[in-house]
A protein has these predicted regions:
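ABC-type ATPase nucleotide-binding domains, specifically the catalytic core motifs of the NBD
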Residues: 1-8, 16-21, 113, 131
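ABC ATPase signature
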Residues: 31, 44-45
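A short, proline-enriched helix->beta-strand linker immediately N-terminal to the Walker B motif
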Residues: 46-50
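Catalytic Walker B motif of ABC-type/P-loop ATPase nucleotide-binding domains
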Residues: 52-56
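Conserved ABC ATPase signature
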Residues: 27-31, 35
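Helical segment within the ABC ATPase nucleotide-binding domain
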Residues: 67-81
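Short, glycine/charged-rich "phosphate-handling" switch motifs in NTP-dependent
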Residues: 100, 112
Length: 131
C-alpha cells in the first residue's frame, strides 16, 4: 500500500471523526472512552471492510458522544453501503440505526424483524423498550 493512499485514508477518517483530528498528537491511551471507540472504528475502517462488527459501542460513553458515534455508523451504512453488525444493550438507540433486529434474552432470540416491526410491537415495547 502506498503511503499517499494511507495518508488519504487517514485524512478521510479525520473528516468523519473530527475529534480524532483535534487530538492527533495525543497517545491513544490518553483519549477519552468515546474517542478511543472512534479510533478503534477508524482503524478498522482503514482496511476497507465490507462488514463492521461493533460490540456494545455505547458502553461507558457520554450520551452526546454516543449520539455522535451512532450518527456516524448510520451514515457509513447509508452512504458507503457498509454492513454493520451491532450488538447493543441500548435497544432504543439501536433501533434508530438498525434495518434488521434480533432481540436476545439470555442468549436466545426472542423476537426478530425489521426495526419498524420491533418498535411497533406493544409487547416488545413494554418488555424491552421501557414503553
Amino acid at each position: 500500500v502506498r503511503r499517499d493512499a494511507v495518508d488519504a485514508d487517514i485524512a478521510r477518517w479525520y473528516e468523519v471523526f473530527p475529534r480524532l483530528a483535534e487530538r492527533r498528537s495525543q497517545r491513544a491511551g490518553s483519549l477519552s472512552g468515546g474517542e478511543q471507540q472512534m479510533l478503534a472504528i477508524a482503524r478498522a475502517l482503514m482496511s476497507k471492510p465490507k462488514l463492521l462488527l461493533c460490540d456494545e459501542p455505547s458502553l461507558g460513553l457520554a450520551p452526546l458522544i454516543t449520539q455522535e458515534l451512532f450518527e456516524v455508523l448510520k451514515k457509513l451504512n447509508a452512504d458507503e453501503g457498509l454492513s454493520i453488525l451491532l450488538v447493543e444493550q441500548n435497544a432504543n438507540l439501536a433501533l434508530k440505526v438498525a434495518h434488521r433486529v434480533y432481540l436476545l434474552e439470555t442468549g436466545n432470540v426472542v423476537a426478530s424483524g425489521t426495526a419498524a416491526e420491533i418498535s411497533s410491537d406493544d409487547s416488545i415495547r413494554k418488555a424491552y423498550l421501557g414503553a
